[in-house]
UniProtKB/Swiss-Prot annotation:
Source organism, top-level taxon: Bacteria
Protein name (Swiss-Prot/TrEMBL): Diaminobutyrate--2-oxoglutarate transaminase
Family: Belongs to the class-III pyridoxal-phosphate-dependent aminotransferase family.
Cofactor (UniProt): pyridoxal 5'-phosphate
Record's keyword annotation contains Transferase: yes
Pfam families: Aminotran_3
Pathway stated in the Swiss-Prot or TrEMBL entry: Amine and polyamine biosynthesis; ectoine biosynthesis; L-ectoine from L-aspartate 4-semialdehyde: step 1/3
Enzyme Commission number(s) of this protein: 2.6.1.76
Gene: ectB
SUPFAM superfamilies per record: PLP-dependent transferases
InterPro entries associated with the record: Aminotrans_3, Aminotrans_3_PPA_site, Dat, Ectoine_EctB, PyrdxlP-dep_Trfase, PyrdxlP-dep_Trfase_major, PyrdxlP-dep_Trfase_small
NCBIfam families reported in the protein's UniProt record: dat, ectoine_ectB, PRK09264.1
Natural source organism: Vibrio parahaemolyticus serotype O3:K6 (strain RIMD 2210633)
Amino acid sequence: MDIFKKQESNVRSYSNNFPVVFRKAKGCWLETEQGERYLDFLAGAGSLNYGHNNPVLKQALLEYIEMDGITHGLDMHSEAKAGFLAALDNYILKPRKLDYKVQFTGPTGTNAVEAALKLAKKVKGRSSVVAFTNGFHGCTAGALAATGNQHHRQGNGSSLTNVTRIPFEGYAGVDGLALFETMLNDNSAGMDKPAAVLLETVQGEGGLNAASNEWLQRLSKICKANDILLIVDDIQAGCGRTGTFFSFEPSGIEPDIVTLSKSIGGYGLPMAVVLLKPELDQWKPGEHNGTFRGNNHAFITAAKALEIYWSNDDFETHIKQCSQNVSEVIDRCVRRFPQMFVQKKGRGMMIGIECIHGDLAAEIAKACFDDGMVIETAGPDDEVVKFFCPLTISESELNQGLSIFERAVETIAAKHFKQAS
């Protein structure tokens, strides 16, 4: 551990909560240098929806490397890229009757958000955007300006501008969309007409706040009526995490731009894309570029993941069942321990439980880790315990993790509160 304390920057965060050295991983399990095993209910913050070292994806990648397939090719054509584009079209876009062009950005989610914002401003000729309270979109300047969290924003060191923040659904009891519409139609409101609205349908780092279908439909209607582009940040909520491939599918809306990263690469390899309606593809060649636009190794595993998990409804059915199992445990804990918990948050397997304060959530997460499970928190006060296991988890493994969580809750309840029956 000394090497990390000596040489790695203080900016590290997850490792502070899990002070062990991991050596290998498979499925939903992590293993330390000493051979201790931990259930992974963090899954790379949603980057490992198909699990660690998924054997089918690993085999496809090994075969590609063995035949000396292209590793790095800037944005040149490659068989790997063609395979991914075909898989995305065949298994995701066509079945949902979605017509998007694909832009490969730098390999992180914030790269995709920056590109989406830049394109929206270019197309509309406007400099401002609208974002929402408790939203998180990345830590580079443009994405950070649209992020609500003070902890991340204050690390910038300079002003973060050209973003108007509107209350997300349920925030402080305010109808944010009514306010937004009023401000758009009031010349004295002080809000310049935005190029785009940027949102997460389920706010990951903001505390798993889930927008209703009706709210999303209202927002989409407002954007269309006012010639404003709608950008959905599906970096954490996409690729099945909320139960469908895109988080916005249940609402029936069709965003103008969608950003994807994290699990889009299938194997945990860096990859990010922007999906944009064809009429918005107004880039000039090389106008938005980068050395690592498109990871050919990730193309291989991404295409295989789409083929294996999204060619029929079996995977969605499995996610739905997992979500029901987790929901039952959360609902039971909320009923049994009202002095500890407020409510269930999120949807699908982007789900969690809101504690009465962040210290309690941290204590639960630590107790889980001490009992062999990695689990994290989210929210303004880190008050929400997030259940973010790989979506490929088996029922027995899921139940094992839920048992660890319930044991932690019961231990802490006995320590601090009079236990409910």
